[in-house]
Amino acid sequence: MVVGPSCQPPCGLCLLLLFLLALPLRSQASAGCYGIPGMPGMPGAPGKDGHDGLQGPKGEPGIPAVPGTRGPKGQKGEPGMPGHRGKNGPRGTSGLPGDPGPRGPPGEPGVEGRYKQKHQSVFTVTRQTTQYPEANALVRFNSVVTNPQGHYNPSTGKFTCEVPGLYYFVYYTSHTANLCVHLNLNLARVASFCDHMFNSKQVSSGGVLLRLQRGDEVWLSVNDYNGMVGIEGSNSVFSGFLLFPD
């Protein structure tokens, strides 16, 4: 049996299918040409990804970019979170004094001070002589009984105020003739006391309250009736003392 030269073997991926289809026919045909190729089979499942290839060579440098123009100003952003408190800075220079504040309430009474020693003024002097004082003149008392502050001056016969306030002045005189005594404050006559002689010896007195300022002077004087004496048992006394300081 001669085999025709037109028959060619199958190829490609369809070989397996053609082989399977041709198995029944081959049992019947003992000789002859191959059959017609069958239809293409269904595509197989996708294969797995292959392994990474080798790193390629370094590329050429790119073209330099052209600087762009500045864009418009953006919108104001939201305030950020407050930061941590910083360290205290150096102390600044002192400011100008402020205005005085309102007056506060009265405080508690303080400890009692040495009021008595700071506000004392007292004296007592006597006139010890049998001679009458000069008429129409100041009367000097030449013997000091007490004068701790030295506010009475025996040389001038005047008391000088050093502690302003209310004072009391008093005198007691012995006289053997008519007597008029004037109590003077600075250049003014404050009070006059006159006593006319009825017996061989008499006593008269007078007193006055005066409010004095620092530097005021107080003294006694007589007029033509000047029968004042000062002998043992018949003294003439002039006293003054501070009652209430200002």
UniProtKB/Swiss-Prot annotation:
Function: Core component of the complement C1 complex, a multiprotein complex that initiates the classical pathway of the complement system, a cascade of proteins that leads to phagocytosis and breakdown of pathogens and signaling that strengthens the adaptive immune system.
Residues annotated with 4-hydroxyproline modification: 37, 40, 43, 46, 64, 82, 97, 100, 106
GO terms for biological process, alphabetical: complement activation, classical pathway; innate immune response; negative regulation of granulocyte differentiation; negative regulation of macrophage differentiation; synapse pruning
Annotated localization: Secreted; Cell surface
Organism lineage: Eukaryota, Metazoa, Chordata, Craniata, Vertebrata
Superkingdom as given in the UniProt entry: Eukaryota
Disulfide bonds: 180-194
Biased composition (Pro residues): 99-108
Reported regulation of activity: The C1Q subcomplex is inhibited by sulfated molecules, such as triterpenoid sulfates, heparan sulfate, or chondroitin sulfates.
Entry domain remark: The C1q domain is the ligand-recognition domain, which specifically recognizes and binds the Fc regions of IgG or IgM immunoglobulins. The collagen-like domain interacts with C1R and C1S proenzymes.
Native organism: Mus musculus (Mouse)
Region feature Disordered, mapped onto this chain: 44-116
One CC-aspect GO term: collagen trimer
Primary site of residence: secreted
Gene giving rise to this polypeptide: C1qc
Record PTM 5-hydroxylysine, positions in chain: 76
Subunit structure: Core component of the complement C1 complex, a calcium-dependent complex composed of 1 molecule of the C1Q subcomplex, 2 molecules of C1R and 2 molecules of C1S. The C1Q subcomplex is composed 18 subunits: 3 chains of C1QA, C1QB, and C1QC trimerize to form 6 collagen-like triple helices connected to six globular ligand-recognition modules (C1q domain).
Signal peptide limits: 1-29
PTM annotation, UniProt: O-linked glycans consist of Glc-Gal disaccharides bound to the oxygen atom of post-translationally added hydroxyl groups.
Name this polypeptide is given: Complement C1q subcomponent subunit C
